[in-house]
Amino acid sequence: MLDKSVLYNVSEKPGVYIFKNGSEYIYIGKAKNLKRRLNSHFSLKEEKSRLIVEESNSLEVIIVKNEKEALLLEATLIFKHKPKYNIMLKEGERYPYIRISDDEYPYVEVTRSRKSSGIFFGPFTNITFTRLLLEILQKIFGVRTCKKDLSKIKKPCIEYHLKTCLAPCKFENKNIYMSAINNLKKVLSGDFEFVKDYIEQKMNYHSKMLDFENAAKYRDLLLSFEKLLNTQGVILNDKRCVDYIAYSKKVFLVLKVRGGVLLSKLFYEANLSFEEFLYQFYYGMKSDLPTKIVTFESSNLNKIEFDIPINVSLDDSDRYLLEIAYENLKEHFKAKRLRRDTLKKIKEILGLKKIPYRIEGTDISHRNGKFTVASLVVFENGVPKPEEYRRYKLGDILDDFESIRMFIRKRYTKHEAPDLIFVDGGRGQVNAAIEAFNELGLDVDVVGIAKKEEIIVTKNKEFKLKENDEVLRTLISIRDETHRVANSFSGSLKLKNYTLSKLDDIPGIGPKRKKILLKKYKSIENIKNAPLEELSKIVGNKIALRLKEYL
């Protein structure tokens, strides 16, 4: 624990202070008056301040010229070191980005993490939209999505033969590949007219060459691209690239408009000032920056570090989009209140020991007694947390009750039990879960829903609720999510086993060819029905004939 004597020589000037324990960063803060701010920490009036001082063994102070410099330096250090007690924009961890790596021949990927190097575009709201966007753009420009060491690749993969990758592994023309990467950057920065013009040029070229197959391919890509953008709802007449920020009760909402299209609606809950939020949100962004930030919030900043104007004069469409942002904030708070009230109601109706702020749900899925899987889904404050979902392989168990007991032993010998466990099933499943918890010496509330009748089952009672009851709807949403996750994984295990037994028995089909075939055709049945000529282009005449013979 630090002694208050470390403050004797601290200046009263503005600056940044760093609490550390050895090499671990405990807390980083800024102050207009360093001595006054640090004295407040050492008064130990707040629990957080007490923990910071108790867990630190050193204090560093950096003096700067003014409060704005302190704000920027604080954001820089927090982004770099991610201290234990600093408030981060954690909601941002769940939003997806499109990343272009910094390799000599860059690859592209969808990721939720910004820990790697490279150029990031986003964040986007919806993972499905993000993946589809990258899939379409990858086919248009031919950039690679594989992460392989290109120097170890002997020949191009199937993507090259399908003309969806320029195959930088051939090392033929770096300028052409980097031009494709630059085109991709341009589109991801919001220049959607560029990609439309690019596709139309390709269509016209192939049409003139009487290559109608490729002309049709680019026509379909253009239609797919336009259809995907139209799913975003708001499309403006102009091609602005603007961020609209609404703020209320420590919740920030950012509407990202790029190329006149509303690409993202991003919520962040953080106990930060408006200026602190701006620095945390925009710090580290080297691309995908707006031309301006529009907000009703008063700010001491005329522009942030990247020279982005703030609070410029608003036109009618600016006001319209800010009104949309604030309406969404209202709905956010309304939904939050409803979830909180529903959790309280769940406690009362089910007779729980405490409000179930954390609910974990499980469902057992199998295929005729094989590929048995337990899915785990997590809801916190009534909101799903997909990043904490897990799947547990249980082998070939046909007994539903024993599967539940095995899952609980696997999960809760290593992890803390939640406020409430949901199991998909009735009295038998609930009792099996309770028995397993008793074996572990844990007293955990368990609830299930019997299929078809929608009868709610707890340790001591069984009852029905009206179809529109919020408690029933919440439990059903958890059940449906567990069911979806379990079935998707069990199905993938079945497919994996099936492909092993079929393709691996064919001479000449190794892991690489198998991967190529399944990526192209998705299933054994599709491979079986594929034209011989088409298969020959992918795996050669000899292997294509063998596929036809064996399948």
From Swiss-Prot:
UniProt keyword Metal-binding, yes or no:
no
Q: Where is the UVR domain?
A: 193-228
Q: Which compartment or compartments is the protein found in?
A: Cytoplasm
GO CC terms for this protein?
cytoplasm; excinuclease repair complex
Cysteine-cysteine disulfides: none
Residue ranges occupied by any GIY-YIG domain in the UniProt entry: 12-87
Describe its function. The UvrABC repair system catalyzes the recognition and processing of DNA lesions. UvrC both incises the 5' and 3' sides of the lesion. The N-terminal half is responsible for the 3' incision and the C-terminal half is responsible for the 5' incision.
Entry-linked NCBIfam families: uvrC
Subunit description: Interacts with UvrB in an incision complex.
Instruction: Provide the family line.
Output: Belongs to the UvrC family.
Name the chain's protein.
UvrABC system protein C
Name of the gene this protein is made from: uvrC
